[in-house]
Amino acid sequence: MGLLDAKVSNRNVLVTSVDNVMNWARLSSLWPMGFGLACCAIEMMATNASNYDLERFGIFPRSSPRQSDLMIVAGTVTMKMAERVVTLYEQMPEPRYVLSMGSCSNCGGPYWDHGYHVLKGVDRVIPVDVYVPGCPPRPEALIGGLMKIQELIRMEGLGISREEALKKLAEKSVDAQQVLDQTRKAAIA
């Protein structure tokens, strides 16, 4: 027991950093703005329903970009809609995060080859923090993406940039192919 422990052991004292308190407050109260454009919007609405109860994670949907800190782009982004996506993104206060949900918003989806009117990934117009794959992704996948956003917020701080936090998050993430290979080796042995 050190000198500090002896002095604060009988009192209600919390020793932490400002970064930890700010990050805890931000990750415990995410306010997403859903930008539902196609099939993925149906799954996003199902995720917000009572079966999955996002409010237990501190996630409260907002309809205004000025009140939200997370934009969920769900569905096909056309060339004409891209300008509006950028406008809404710019109206969000800092720090702001973007979650791309579904194949269409990630890379153009089935319209990749023949859809001249479809943006080949929303990351061409705004920075994306987390991608949720699927066509359309299940609500569980969206919840997993939201939890990744919360991990990203937890890793950020005054001395750590978002790029550094994203690199740490990518290193921490488990590669699905490695898990499959390990499972196959265990089954063979």
Curated annotation (Swiss-Prot):
One of its GO terms (biological process) is aerobic respiration. It is a peripheral membrane protein. One of its GO terms (cellular component) is plasma membrane. It holds the Pfam family Oxidored_q6. It catalyses: a quinone + NADH + 5 H(+)(in) = a quinol + NAD(+) + 4 H(+)(out). Binds 1 [4Fe-4S] cluster. GO terms for molecular function: 4 iron, 4 sulfur cluster binding; iron ion binding; NADH dehydrogenase (ubiquinone) activity; NADH:ubiquinone reductase (non-electrogenic) activity; quinone binding. NCBIfam families: nuoB_fam, PRK06411.1, PRK14813.1. Belongs to the complex I 20 kDa subunit family. NDH-1 is composed of 14 different subunits. Subunits NuoB, C, D, E, F, and G constitute the peripheral sector of the complex. NDH-1 shuttles electrons from NADH, via FMN and iron-sulfur (Fe-S) centers, to quinones in the respiratory chain. The immediate electron acceptor for the enzyme in this species is believed to be a menaquinone. Couples the redox reaction to proton translocation (for every two electrons transferred, four hydrogen ions are translocated across the cytoplasmic membrane), and thus conserves the redox energy in a proton gradient. This is NADH-quinone oxidoreductase subunit B. It comes from Chlorobaculum parvum (strain DSM 263 / NCIMB 8327) (Chlorobium vibrioforme subsp. thiosulfatophilum). The gene is nuoB.
